[in-house]
Amino acid sequence: MKHIVSIDQCSAEDILRILDRAELFEKNPNRHLLEGKVVATLFFEPSTRTRLSFETAVNRLGGRIIGFSDASTSSSTKGESLKDTISMVGNYADLIIMRHYLEGAARYASEVSRVPVVNAGDGANQHPSQTLLDLYSIRKTQGTLYDRTIAMVGDLKYGRTIHSLIEGMSHFRPRFIFVAPEELSLPEEYKQFCREHDLPYTETKHFDEEVINNCDILYMTRVQRERFTDLEEYERVKDVYVLTNAMLSDSRPNLRVLHPLPRVGEIAYDVDDNPKAYFIRQALNGLYTRQSIICEVLGIDVAN
């Protein structure tokens, strides 16, 4: 694959190949496979984990980084079009990693770029590198990607990690439990996707032990203030679901709690020391997965 802009472009074989390669990087992340390569990280929207893990991935692979983490320092503030920005950066870099606030921006960038483009998140649309690290974390903790029940909790309307994970898991016979208030319920297009792909799901507004005790993966999300135009609506729903340690007491032994981070208050700090809390390790898995993604789009072979 020259570009990775959406998880739906990845077949099951593509996903498993990327995850298998990530395992090699977990065993040895310091492989100088990008010697002489320049990678541009263009972050038009704030990021901590995604940007730092991509930049760490490049550094550990021996490449060099150019770009920006604040769009106000770029020529976009002068009115430069995305097309011109991508075309210009493509003159200097071998790979572009981009986060943008507009849905579809990454796909457009891939259409006008002469070098590979990796989508690091575009609006409320897609976040394929997060999905791949989520899949890596699920396989690592469950021993398989197949036949898992995944409860997705919180902001299912704007949560691009949710949307991407539904599509990414569709190859592996999942069952879903969607937990959200009406204002943040899963968009109809993703419910239709589940129906078209014979993916069983249930919906509920209630986050309780009945949900927690019947899933293998509990995928928590924050309510994203930056997606709201009505702050009163945000205040009304931001704390509607909070996971506490006591709520995990009767959960399945194999249950793991995932979260794309940052958390705001939806996971209490008393959960952190529970062995079922996996979200910090999940973030570390992003390093290995993103090293694998970089090698995928650049066509770099990785030896055992």
Curated annotation (Swiss-Prot):
Instruction: Quote one Gene Ontology molecular function term.
Output: amino acid binding
EC number(s) reported in the record: 2.1.3.2
Q: Which Gene3D superfamilies match?
A: Aspartate/ornithine carbamoyltransferase (3.40.50.1370)
Q: Which InterPro entries match?
A: Asp/Orn_carbamoyltranf_P-bd, Asp/Orn_carbamoylTrfase, Asp/Orn_carbamoylTrfase_sf, Asp_carbamoyltransf, Asp_carbamoyltransf_Asp/Orn-bd
Which pathway does it take part in? Pyrimidine metabolism; UMP biosynthesis via de novo pathway; (S)-dihydroorotate from bicarbonate: step 2/3
Q: Which reaction does it catalyse?
A: carbamoyl phosphate + L-aspartate = N-carbamoyl-L-aspartate + phosphate + H(+)
This molecule's function is given as: Catalyzes the condensation of carbamoyl phosphate and aspartate to form carbamoyl aspartate and inorganic phosphate, the committed step in the de novo pyrimidine nucleotide biosynthesis pathway.
On assembly, the entry states: Heterododecamer (2C3:3R2) of six catalytic PyrB chains organized as two trimers (C3), and six regulatory PyrI chains organized as three dimers (R2).
Q: What is this protein called?
A: Aspartate carbamoyltransferase catalytic subunit
